[in-house]
Amino acid sequence: MGTAEMQGRLWGPGARDWSELNEPSCVPFYEAVFDAIAVRPGTALLDAGCGGGFALQLAAKRGAAVTGLDACGPLLDIARERVPDADLRQGDLESLPFAEHMFDAVTAFNSIQFASDLLAVMGELRRVARPGAPVAILIWGAPERCKSRVILAAIGGLLPPPPPGAEGPFALSAPGKLEELAEKAGLVPERADEVPTPLIYPDLDTAVRTQLSSGPARMAIEYAGEPATRKALAAAFADSRQPDGSYRQDNVFRYLIARA
């Protein structure tokens, strides 16, 4: 099973919860990136790994002509509900189904690190961007600045050891690593910045439900069962409880803007 096929299978069962409970929390970094690359009326934008289309919806409200690609059919169905006029394709980040130089801007929000061939993905993002167009890649910031690392660790603790070279969600978070990859793919790094993005849940049930909808959690469920996965997530959230009963995890995300 290829990477795209596997990711599509894992993210499908929780697509509705992920798109409705998690994606709205990402507005701070969606908007920061769209501001940085000047998304405006008429911008031909590709979001690679678009999920349920929340970012595409925001870009469309700015007047952009939006295109999205994702491996997960159920997430794309939700994206179609949100952005009926978008051009949405199911496919693989490592082999984008688009001609060369199609887009004025390309974004990838926390998606490329799930691919098996990172260099191939970056090369594809460059290929479909018009010469000189911005390619914006957003990833987790340094693990020590991301409280949600405890959630990722809890899920990882239920899984068998990853294959050699599989570095997980923080695969590109080390200083300079994303820039180095971009340069190898023929992109020209222009600027990088960080966006604080807290994840806030009204109660523990919502917090656990949100994380259970992710692809990595689905993999943990397949290996360890849902009760064990729920228990591990609840324990990981324990020290994020706020006085009002809500749960908050402060995180920093980092984005790079490079030119094709």
Predicted regions and their residues:
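Conserved class I S-adenosyl-L-methionine
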Residues: 1-43, 54-58, 74-78, 82, ...
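A short SAM/SAH-binding and catalytic strip from SAM-dependent methyltransferases
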Residues: 104-119, 141
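Conserved catalytic/acceptor-binding region of the Class I
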Residues: 119, 126, 132-202, 218-219, ...
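Class I SAM-dependent methyltransferase SAM/SAH-binding core
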Residues: 44-96, 120
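Conserved Class I S-adenosyl-L-methionine
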Residues: 6-7, 25-26, 52-54, 171-260
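A short acidic, Gly/Pro-enriched loop at the edge of an enzyme's catalytic core
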Residues: 94-105
